[in-house]
Amino acid sequence: GGVTGVYYPTGGAICRMMARTRADHGIRCGAESTGGSVYNVNAVRAGELEFGVAQSDVQFKALNGVDSFKAQGANPKLRSVFSIHPEPFTVVARKDAGIKSFEDLKGKRVNVGNPGSGQRDTMEVLMKKMGWTMADFALASELQAAEQSQALCDNNIDAMVYTVGHPAGSIKE
């Protein structure tokens, strides 16, 4: 994920741990900033990454070839190595936006997440359940996690959604 999320520092911590025993296994590890969960599992499937961090629901969809991974089909070679932390779906709204519930997002300026991110994937699932499309928002922005907090503070969006472990840097902003 992005540098202000939890995946990037988690990847860095894993790489530091791997570096301590590199003489034993010879594996080099580098943390990269990426588009997020969907991007990561697709990059692992394509052989562009050997290891990636992803939301468990995204892993499930990729493994079974359902929802956003239906067109690609199941990926039976995908493996879950370990779980890091829970990632609640979080909605942050401007106090003056009149948003008190998820339903209140309709008709507002909402950052739905960048394509390839777990937050976008989760938001699309929720939108489908609500019977919404992108057209139901006054603005459906596709900012990356690192950009959405500033957009909220600058009054460019009314709300942002984020599937992230807490504490998260961009929400602290």
Language model regions located:
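N-terminal (or domain-start) structured segment
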Residues: 1-61, 70-71
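Bilobed "Venus flytrap"/periplasmic-binding protein-like clamshell domains
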Residues: 1-21, 83, 87-154
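Solvent-exposed coil/turn segments that connect beta secondary-structure elements
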Residues: 49, 56-59, 86, 94-97, ...
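Pocket-lining segment of extracytoplasmic ligand-binding domains
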Residues: 56-58, 67, 97, 134-173
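A structural signal for short loop-to-beta-strand junctions that line the ligand-binding cleft
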Residues: 70-84, 89
